[in-house]
Amino acid sequence: MYVLNRKGEEEDISFDQILKRIQRLSYGLHELVDPARVTQGVINGMYSGIKTCELDELAAQTCAYMATTHPDFSILAARITTDNLHKNTSDDVAEVAEALYTYKDVRGRPASLISKEVYDFILLHKDRLNKEIDYTRDFNYDYFGFKTLERSYLLRINNKIIERPQHLLMRVSIGIHIDDIDKALETYHLMSQKYFTHATPTLFNSGTPRPQMSSCFLLSMKADSIEGIFETLKQCALISKTAGGIGVAVQDIRGQNSYIRGTNGISNGLVPMLRVFNDTARYVDQGGGKRKGSFAVYIEPWHSDIFEFLDLRKNHGKEELRARDLFYAVWVPDLFMKRVKENKNWTLMCPNECPGLSETWGEEFEKLYTKYEEENMGKKTVLAQDLWFAILQSQIETGVPYMLYKDSCNAKSNQKNLGTIKCSNLCCEIIEYTSPDEVAVCNLASIALCKFVDLEKKEFNFKKLYEITKIITRNLDKIIERNYYPVKEAKTSNTRHRPIGIGVQGLADTFMLLRYPYESDAAKELNKRIFETMYYAALEMSVELASIHGPYESYQGSPASQGILQFDMWNAKVDNKYWDWDELKAKIRKHGLRNSLLLAPMPTASTSQILGNNESFEPYTSNIYYRRVLSGEFFVVNPHLLKDLFDRGLWDEDMKQQLIAHNGSIQYISEIPDDLKELYKTVWEIKQKNIIDMAADRGIFIDQSQSLNIYIQKPTFAKLSSMHFYGWEKGLKTGAYYLRTQAATDAIKFTVDTHVAKNAVKLKNADGVQITREVSRETISTESTVTQNVCPLRRNNDEQCLMCSG
């Protein structure tokens, strides 16, 4: 049997050659990772004439399939893939920069992949950069993290990867700190050690000729006219082209059958317009096929087209009334929630005939809205609960609309001196002011919280978190200056208000490393302390930057300029037990702030996969799940659980089959002790009330908002109403990002041993699980109030709410 080497030459291959290579890469791994076993798997999959690079990929896949035996197999898989990349790429920073800078397109025209100033910087400092860059850190990614980088992030020439992960991180760091090599290297080392990561657009574009590094763009319509609509559409296309996610407020566009003075005609309403936006999102992807364009459309529930809006993403119905590639959100005023709760009427209005509703909030909105009602200016009057149930029905069917509370978002914003905030972004964590002349922008980064756990002492390092939050704050502020803006209105907004968004990933991993169950008092206290530390550190760095460069342009008149911080807007008392807030407020009074907004925990979907952490502040959704890469699907087991089961001698093929049979839950597996069952509860087994409580606890330190998903296995109107009203009453800004549900019946699990599965089902049924009658729309009388329609158990005991019981 022979292989084709990198020169295309035939070469004999032996078991020993493959074994030696795998042994070389198995350093520091668990003894269960047996190179001989891996080698045998590779030999079994080989064929004569296989290329050496394909042989490496086969070896990596073999290890990835074995990762359910022990997580170190995933590390070995990544090492094999990384070693293969290293063989095909240069270890000289300047050489890589030369290739990227001198690249020419198919017609021979210069098409540099990095900017001239970055190229010149690398040549000037090449000796120091080559000394500082640490390629061994490439071997610290797991297989799926490395594959994510390989698929979308590492720069290519003619479809051949040129960058190593360390080159990527160095490029990003230099792109941010082009004028300061020490700060560039500080950022590089912290990112390469996985303490934090900048957001995907920053990783894509930093250091390139057009460094569009911002993640989030928020727009309001230019005008309620053909010119205004298509100018806004063009803005969306230009932003999407450069990898920005978009939130756009459409409540100022007139509704269906509204009079058009210019043509003496009537409007077709929102639906035909949104179908055009839908096709634009499909056509303009984010940077040449890296990921799809994504637009979230925001509307207020008084708009006359609200019912048609709620149907746009549904799978059934007429195609001309659907726009399924957009995401939808409702910007909910408190008045609507009160009317729903009290089972009162709700009037739908056209913004063309009832102007000013989108420009007001709180009492001012209520006065204007009721004035229009009294003057019979509305288009239609419905029961508030009928609209409420239409919202819930759409959420159950499609997972959207997102729910954000307009009054809470405006009342608790440090930008409320600018005007009324009309929408959020694609992921519901950015709350910023927009206008026809300003497109709001936010640059993001996330902190890997699990890196701050001292495993020996079982302690969390708040001092290190404080230090790194300050560095990230400085980085994100620097990006505002370094950024390429796809539209001028974005530059206007970002340079005036200078908001940034710092988030987290791996909070659930942090709890597991510290042995804190997600619902425990210790976890709840740590949750609060983490975000207090981050908010304090970000504010302190913003003050330091303001003392050097001056406060942001629109600072005067903001709550912060009056000594009011985020927790003050929640009427929460925060003492000086951990951080001296009085001293910080004194510094703010003296110097001001460089940034209007600072914290915005985002979903971290891609970057958490790169770093090997659980998403954001979310609990684990399952303890076993699929990861898809181009070469196939792989089972992945929660690595913390796998280690615990392995250390206790409980992990074997039978346990794996039981875990699959129970959809990744361990609650009904009798062999597993109770302490592990508490620690490894999935999100479906955690009380939703506790998740909302923890969101509110950290919310007093989050001056933007947070991407809060809601998880209900079998949603009903009663459960959803209970959950939404609880979040609203707790003062959340984002009440719900996505509604996540579980399928009523599981897909057939071909990999599950049927004998094990039958025993698992018997055990589960024997465990006293109660069957609760489902509540449907038909079982709820429109005569009753939502207060009566909540889960029956919650009426007398909040702790026993069906929505909360997991």
From Swiss-Prot:
InterPro entries: ATP-cone_dom, NrdE_NrdA_C, RNR_lg_C, RNR_lsu_N, RNR_R1-su_N, Rrm1. The active site is at N425, C427, E429. It comes from the Eukaryota. Under complex allosteric control mediated by deoxynucleoside triphosphates and ATP binding to separate specificity and activation sites on the large subunit. The type of nucleotide bound at the specificity site determines substrate preference. It seems probable that ATP makes the enzyme reduce CDP and UDP, dGTP favors ADP reduction and dTTP favors GDP reduction. Stimulated by ATP and inhibited by dATP binding to the activity site. The record marks C216, C442 as: Important for hydrogen atom transfer. Disulfide bonds join C216-C442. ATP binds at N5, R6, E11, D12, I13, S14, F15, D16, Q17, T52, D56. GO terms for molecular function: ATP binding; ribonucleoside-diphosphate reductase activity, thioredoxin disulfide as acceptor. DTTP binds at D224, S225, I226, K241, R254, R261, G262. Keywords: Allosteric enzyme, ATP-binding, Deoxyribonucleotide synthesis, Disulfide bond, Nucleotide-binding, Oxidoreductase. The record marks C801, C804 as: Interacts with thioredoxin/glutaredoxin. The keyword rRNA-binding does not apply. GO terms for biological process: deoxyribonucleotide biosynthetic process. Its EC number is 1.17.4.1. One of its GO terms (cellular component) is ribonucleoside-diphosphate reductase complex. CDD domains: RNR_I (cd01679). It catalyses: a 2'-deoxyribonucleoside 5'-diphosphate + [thioredoxin]-disulfide + H2O = a ribonucleoside 5'-diphosphate + [thioredoxin]-dithiol. Heterodimer of a large and a small subunit. Provides the precursors necessary for DNA synthesis. Catalyzes the biosynthesis of deoxyribonucleotides from the corresponding ribonucleotides. This is Ribonucleoside-diphosphate reductase large subunit.
